[in-house]
C-alpha cells in the first residue's frame, strides 16, 4: 500500500531509522518550492512524482560495510585505472573522511586517491606539501595518492555554460579511466554546502582553475575572490558538468553525511558540528545526490545551522543551475539499504 506524505523527516543517529512526518508546506518554505512530493512504498523506496527519476541509495550505517553497500547498489562497477576523488583535509581540520572508513572501497576498486592543489595560502598549495598532508592524514597508508596538477593543468570543454567555456583541471586526470567522486557533505563558507558538485568542480580544478571558477571565468590569478556570488555558484555547476561529460558512463558519486560542520574541510579551525550524523548516499546523478543530501539536512531537527549557512550563501543555486544546464535532475528516488 502506498501512503502519501508531504515531507520526509529522517532521523539517523546511531541506529538505522527512517521516519516521515509533518507537512510539505512548512518544509518547502524552509527549503525551496521545488521539493518533490514523495510517498512511501511497501519496499521502503521513497519515490518522487516521476517514477523514472534517478535513484539515490541511502544507508544510515556510516562504516565500511555501509559505504560498500551503497556503492554496490549503483550497479556500475568501477573498472580500468580508477581514481577516487576525495578531500585530503587541511592540517588541523578533523572532519575529513576517515581513511579507515573508505579503505575497503578504495581497495576493492583498486583505486588511486586523487586530489588537486589549492590556491596559495593553504598548506596544500603545492604538490610536495600536499603529498605530506595526504601521508599525515593516513591516505597514503591505504592507497597510492596522486596530486593531479602537480606538474601542469589542462583545459577541458564546458558545454552549455553561462559563464565558462572551458575548465582547468589537473593534467594527470588523463591517466585514469574511471572516476569515483567520494565526497564529504558539509557546509561551506563560500558555496553554502559542499558535496558532489563542489568536489567535481573546485575539487578537480587545478590551483589556477580554482581561481577561474571563483572568478566565473575572468582570471586564473585571484585566489578565492569572487565579484559575483551567483556567478561563482553557477560556474561551479558548469565546471562539474565538464568533468561529468568527460567521464560519461565512467563516473559515480558517493556523499558521506557525517561531521556536519557549517565549514568545509579546507579550514584548519572549522566550526564544530551542531547536528547528528545522517548517513551515506550514492547515485549516478550528482544533482540528485546533492539534492537528496540537502533535503535530509533541511528535514533534520538539528539542521538549523547548516540550513542557515546554505541560505546565507544562496547555495541552492548551484543545484538549480546544474539541473538547468543538463547535468542531472533534482527529482530522485531515495532507496534505503
Language-model-detected regions and their locations in the chain:
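N-terminal secretory signal peptides that target proteins for export/translocation
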Residues: 1-4
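Sec-dependent N-terminal signal peptides of Gram-positive bacterial secreted proteins and lipoproteins
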Residues: 7-26
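Intrinsically disordered, low-complexity segments enriched in Ser/Pro/Gly/Ala and basic residues
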Residues: 10-11, 25, 33, 52, ...
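Sec-dependent signal peptide cleavage junction
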Residues: 21-39
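N-terminal low-complexity, Pro/Thr/Ser-rich intrinsically disordered segments
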Residues: 35-56
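Extended, low-polarity segments enriched in aliphatic/aromatic residues
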Residues: 50-337
Amino acid at each position: 500500500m502506498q501512503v502519501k506524505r508531504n515531507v520526509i523527516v529522517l532521523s539517523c543517529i546511531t541506529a538505522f531509522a527512517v521516519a516521515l512526518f509533518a507537512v510539505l508546506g512548512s518544509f518547502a518554505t524552509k527549503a525551496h518550492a521545488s521539493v518533490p512530493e514523495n510517498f512511501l512504498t511497501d519496499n521502503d523506496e521513497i519515490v518522487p512524482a516521476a517514477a523514472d527519476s534517478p535513484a539515490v541509495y541511502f544507508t544510515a550505517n556510516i562504516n565500511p560495510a555501509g559505504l560498500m553497500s551503497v556503492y554496490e547498489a549503483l550497479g556500475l562497477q568501477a573498472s580500468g585505472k580508477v581514481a577516487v576523488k576525495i578531500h585530503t583535509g587541511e592540517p588541523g581540520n578533523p572532519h575529513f573522511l576517515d581513511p579507515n572508513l573508505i579503505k575497503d572501497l578504495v581497495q576493492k576498486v583498486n583505486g588511486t586517491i586523487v586530489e588537486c592543489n589549492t590556491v596559495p595560502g593553504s598548506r596544500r598549495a603545492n604538490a610536495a606539501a600536499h603529498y605530506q598532508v595526504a601521508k599525515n592524514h593516513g591516505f597514503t597508508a591505504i592507497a597510492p595518492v596522486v596530486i593531479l596538477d602537480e606538474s601542469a593543468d589542462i583545459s577541458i570543454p564546458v558545454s552549455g555554460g553561462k559563464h565558462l567555456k572551458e575548465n582547468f583541471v589537473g593534467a594527470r586526470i588523463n591517466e585514469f579511466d574511471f572516476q569515483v567522486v567520494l565526497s564529504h557533505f558539509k557546509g561551506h563558507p563560500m558555496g553554502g554546502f559542499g558535496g558532489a558538485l563542489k568536489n567535481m568542480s573546485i575539487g578537480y580544478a587545478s590551483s589556477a582553475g580554482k581561481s577561474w571558477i571563483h572568478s566565473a571565468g575572468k582570471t586564473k590569478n585571484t585566489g578565492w575572490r569572487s565579484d559575483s556570488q551567483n556567478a561563482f555558484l553557477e560556474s561551479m555547476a558548469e565546471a562539474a558538468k565538464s568533468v561529468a561529460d568527460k567521464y560519461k558512463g565512467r563516473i559515480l558519486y558517493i556523499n558521506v553525511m557525517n561531521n556536519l560542520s557549517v565549514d568545509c574541510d579546507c579550514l584548519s579551525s572549522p566550526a564544530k558540528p551542531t547536528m547528528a550524523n545522517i548517513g551515506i548516499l550514492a547515485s549516478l546523478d550528482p544533482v540528485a545526490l546533492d539534492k537528496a543530501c540537502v533535503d535530509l539536512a533541511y528535514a533534520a531537527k538539528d539542521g538549523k545551522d547548516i540550513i542557515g549557512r546554505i541560505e546565507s550563501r544562496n547555495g541552492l543555486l548551484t543545484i538549480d543551475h546544474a539541473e538547468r544546464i543538463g547535468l542531472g535532475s533534482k527529482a530522485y528516488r531515495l532507496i534505503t539499504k
